[in-house]
Amino acid sequence: MPELPEVETVRRGLQPALEGQTLKSVIVRRAKLRIPFPKDFVRRLTGSKVERLGRRAKYLFMHMQGGDVAIIHLGMTGHMTAISGKAPAPGKHDHVDFCTTAGATVRFNDVRRFGLMTLTTEEELETHRLIKNIGPDPLANSFSHEVLSAALKGRATSIKAALLDQKTVAGLGNIYVSESLFRSGISPKRQAKSVQ
């Protein structure tokens, strides 16, 4: 599953193709991925300008002019590719195309269909059910030793389990938690509250 660093790389890679661009069309080739697409997904995005791409944990955000926000999760095998010029015919696992008036296509491919796309608004983004319980983002300027220490205080669970809990630290998965603990010389079985 793509973890926070990979999702941030995807966000940065898609910026030139999407930011500041108007979506000429949005093509959805199946009714659902992990969850059904909102019934008005295509209508609300088509003709709207992508003001900026954001990210929180493993979620990508397409902030649209007018206040809509598309929430995208890549799931286990999902990826997004920017195609300039005429896009090739979609393959079996190419589920969504975002086509801009500038002629670019951003294609979402997901073999296992564990990804998701949904909509919310700027006003409701922080309280959206997928976002509201996510912990601090380790790439945010506000993240610090003190923030992590406070999140681990009193936690009797293992440090590995605590770091994998998205309410403790957002966006970390098994790869980065295991590597970080190994490089720090901290046993993954050590109680979280003992790490200061």
Predicted regions and their residues:
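Short, intrinsically disordered, charge-balanced linker/junction segments flanking boundaries
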Residues: 190-196
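A cross-family signal for N-terminal binding/gating loops and helix N-caps
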Residues: 1-115
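Alpha-helical architecture
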Residues: 56, 171-172
